[in-house]
Amino acid sequence: MRLLLCLLLFSTLLINSTNACPGVITQACFCSEVHSGIVLDCSNSSASGILQIIRTNQAQVGLIQSLTMNQAELVELPPNFFSGLFIRRLDLSQNKIKKIDDAAFAGINPVLEEVVLNHNLIEKVPAAALAGLPNLLRLDLSNNSIVEIQEQEIFPNLNKLYDINLGSNKIFSIHTSTFQNVKNSIQTINLGHNNMTAVPSSAIRGLKQLQSLHLHKNRIEQLDALNFLNLPVLNLLNLAGNQIHELNRQAFLNVPSLRYLYLSGNKITKLTAYQFQTFEQLEMLDLTNNEIGAIPANSLSGLKQLRQLYLAHNKISNISSNAFTNSSIVVLVLSSNELKTLTAGIISGLPNLQQVSFRDNQIKTINRNAFYDAASLVMLDLAKNQLTEIAPTTFLAQLNLLLVDLSENKLPKTPYSAFNSRVGTVLLKENPLVCTENLHMLQQGTGVYVRDSPDIICGRKPTPKPEPVLVPIVTDSLISTQRPALVQIPKMQIHRNVHTTTGDQAPQIPSGAFQQIDLGKSRSLPRGHSRFILDKPSTREQSVEPTEELTPIQPIILPSREDEIRQSSMEAGTSQESVEATSQKIPSTTDIIDRPNVVLPFPVPFLKRGPNLSESKKVESTDMPSTSQVFHTLPPSILIEPGSTPKVAQPSTEANIKSEHIDEFALASSNSNEPTLQPRLEKSFFTTTIIFICVGTAVIVLVVVIAGLCISKHRQLQFENTYSDSSAARTSEYISTQYRQNSLRGTGGRVGRFEESPAWIYNPGSSYCNYYK
């Protein structure tokens, strides 16, 4: 029989590979192809008609990985309702099913692994109907109308069933033998959101494979002795949202693997010393929203595996100094309590502590040694308290401190001295900081001045700064390659209140002649550019009469450096006539007078009268040989070639020119004192050769080293591969064997479901216990 079923399944899979979703089915359902079958969603359609179409096209459909029929007008499940179909997951949620026949699942028993029947009107557990599903792994009966589980409704012998969800029903009583037939396979039981007033200890006792037990949102008032007995692998117990007043230390016996314990939303009033000492593997303890008034000494000590402790929304007003001794807590939440002071050593004995929250308490003072032992602290929340000051060096030992929240306190000034130089962020919003307190950034524990940032104190408007005025700069690229004309500074005329008012016109006040230039943007100018810094002195403006008009500045001839070189080279090889034609008439002194009342552009050459030079004389060339006499009228750096004194034309008497002609001298073409060009070229060539040789040698050495490393790595990999072939084959065979075994048992993906530790969270939130949505 099994061989026939396997052949039928194999043939249907072959046909399915050619045409997975027939057109008739796609018209009524949403069909998608997966790795080993199809997924059908036939919601909002008649279930009877859909199943008839699937049976007709069973040869083409093959294995159905998931069949969903939500809101499919189902009221009951008649006998053989799914016969002839190969379905692995059946979802019949959100219908109005009240009755399930004992033979409703007949015909699909070989492959059915999961049945979802939540959000229906089922009043009893369909134990007889489930008895024909030996391969069932998961059963969801949540959000129904089950009131109690009687003896005839206990779960049948299902050796692979590991997940039962009975949450959100009306269960108040469970028979002792409810889970007796599945005690060797059951791993998760959800009985949350029911009406139980006591822990069903007799029903869950001795479940050796039970890992997660959810009893949240019931009416349990107390934990009696031996409530949780012989649960060796239980790692999650959820008792949140009940009415528990006191924790009995004898309630947990032989529960060594408990890692997550949820006790939030109860009415626990006190904790005793060493109350949780038996939980050697406890990693997370949630006591949020209880009525705990104090944490006595050693009540939470000795928990070497505890990482997260939540004590928010209680009435804690006192914490003993040794309450957390020898614990490895990383996240500690004590927000929304009644603490008024943080004494010295309040969180001592916590070397791994990283996150602490004292938000929304009544803290007024903090002892400077309160956090001395918490050297690994990273985040501290002290918001919504009544702090008026923080003593210096309070957080000096916390070198890893990144965030301190001091919002909504009563701090009149910034407590800079309380932190070390490595603090990352300090939040100070909603504090009554005094008006003289300048807030600024911190860098290495000191204030950082931000350039161009205005200081706003007591709501005073910041002083406006003058906007920079850009002065156009003439670059060399704008100068023509031809011999330019005279380059002169533009004339500048500054009028002071010279505008007269006529009629109703108001007098126009001229703006300042010069503004300061933003030097920060002009520091990267090329060396050859000119940069003018123009200032607006207010004292000078007041000294000028209203009707005075300043004399315009005379143009100044500023020949460029190229013109001077070109002119000197031309003068050396031209005749006397060309010298006369190209000579220029330059006044002996500048016309600019040192007048402090005149606003001039800066810099201006010869702002003051220059030094007096030696008197120059004219030299006339004669036919008689004579010794040339050198007059030192030029700087010593300019040499005059001997015997090449040019002749300068005599001034004409008819022209009646009052200006003087300055004699021009040809520059020396060569000198014995100057070094020749050949040694310089040889020295430059020698230096360049040395540089090229060094660079080439370095490149060759680098290439050889890289090649050697590549060859060594290749040989190492080749050597390792010679020994890894056999081990890789054995590993692949082992993985394949485990996969086949898990496929037969169906529990491979469930073993580690609750082994993963949840991510550390700063605040659990309001819906942290809604494990089943």
From Swiss-Prot:
Any single GO CC term annotated in Swiss-Prot or TrEMBL for this entry: apical part of cell
Species for this entry: Caenorhabditis elegans
Membrane side Extracellular: residue ranges: 21-689
Transmembrane segments: 690-710
Topology, Cytoplasmic side: 711-773
LRR repeats: 61-84, 85-107, 109-132, 133-157, 159-181, 183-206, 207-230, 231-254, 256-278, 279-302, 303-326, 328-349, 350-373, 375-397, 399-421, 486-516
Record's signal peptide: 1-20
Protein name (record): Leucine-rich repeat-containing protein let-4
Membrane topology summary: Single-pass type I membrane protein
A GO biological-process term: positive regulation of membrane permeability
Subcellular location: Apical cell membrane
Record keywords, A-Z: Cell membrane, Leucine-rich repeat, Membrane, Repeat, Signal, Transmembrane, Transmembrane helix
InterPro entries in UniProt: Leu-rich_rpt, Leu-rich_rpt_typical-subtyp, LRR_dom_sf
Database matches in PANTHER family: IG(IMMUNOGLOBULIN) AND LRR(LEUCINE RICH REPEAT) DOMAINS, LEUCINE RICH REPEAT CONTAINING 53
Pfam families, per database record: LRR_8
Expression across tissues: In L1 larvae, expressed in a subset of epithelial cells including epidermal, vulval and rectal cells and the excretory duct and pore. Absent from internal epithelia such as the gut and pharyngeal tubes. Transiently expressed in the excretory canal cell at the 1.5-fold embryonic stage but no longer visible in this cell at hatching.
Role: Required for apical extracellular matrix organization and epithelial junction maintenance.
SUPFAM superfamilies in UniProt: L domain-like
PROSITE patterns to which the protein is assigned, alphabetical: LRR (PS51450)
Keyword set includes Signal: yes
Top-level lineage group: Eukaryota
